[in-house]
């Protein structure tokens, strides 16, 4: 039933609520944006990063811990909220990762990862993976290895185990497209953990 950051991994949010984008990548082909699809109009001024962060913060998201295996065989993981379903046929998911993340190198080498969806009472788990070193984040965390070897965390709402299909460059982040190989849900009505306007939130609040 129920199973399934380093400083470089987390976004600029309060330390007590450092659920954010993560760091990972994979062995699939690395794609870049089509230059013909970008604007060169000098009148188009870019929005300041702080303004963009403030505006996009009004879009509530779920919170996950993305896990994989390092080159030393040890588990790695990072908190991520830039996660979305991409396709049902085939089942694809995308995750946005900080390009400076240590988890990026692990997923790139391993070629697989798991997305663990957190419940409302798992704020501390989210914070641990958002701001601690990779090894310290795993202290006391119960988990088991899935078919790809990626860790599935005990007690989460759902876990999706994926193999890497593509890695797409996107500014200071990379977009990882994963093919979902196995899913597992808790079978409970536990509310999800949300991230909204720079802090954790509940369904009623958001």
Protein language model features and the residues they cover:
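Basic, polyanion-binding surface patches
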Residues: 2-206
């Amino acid at each position: 039933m129920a199973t399934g950051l380093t400083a470089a991994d987390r976004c600029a949010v309060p330390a007590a609520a450092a659920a954010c984008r993560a760091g990972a990548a994979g062995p699939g082909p690395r794609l870049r944006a089509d230059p013909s699809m970008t604007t060169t109009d000098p009148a188009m001024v870019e929005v300041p990063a702080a303004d963009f962060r403030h505006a996009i913060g009004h879009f509530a998201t779920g919170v996950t811990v993305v896990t994989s295996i390092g080159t030393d065989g040890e588990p790695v993981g990072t908190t991520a909220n830039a996660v979305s379903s991409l396709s049902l046929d085939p089942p694809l998911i995308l995750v946005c990762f900080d390009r400076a993340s240590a988890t990026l190198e692990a997923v790139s080498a391993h070629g697989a990862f798991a997305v663990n969806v957190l419940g409302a009472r798992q704020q501390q788990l989210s914070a641990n993976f958002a701001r601690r070193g990779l090894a310290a984040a795993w202290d006391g965390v119960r988990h088991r290895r899935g078919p790809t070897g990626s860790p599935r965390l005990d007690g989460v709402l759902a876990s999706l185990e994926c193999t890497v299909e593509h890695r797409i460059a996107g500014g200071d982040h990379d977009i990882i497209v994963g093919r979902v190989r196995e899913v597992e849900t808790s079978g409970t009505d536990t509310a999800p953990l949300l991230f909204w306007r720079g802090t954790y939130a509940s369904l009623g609040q958001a």
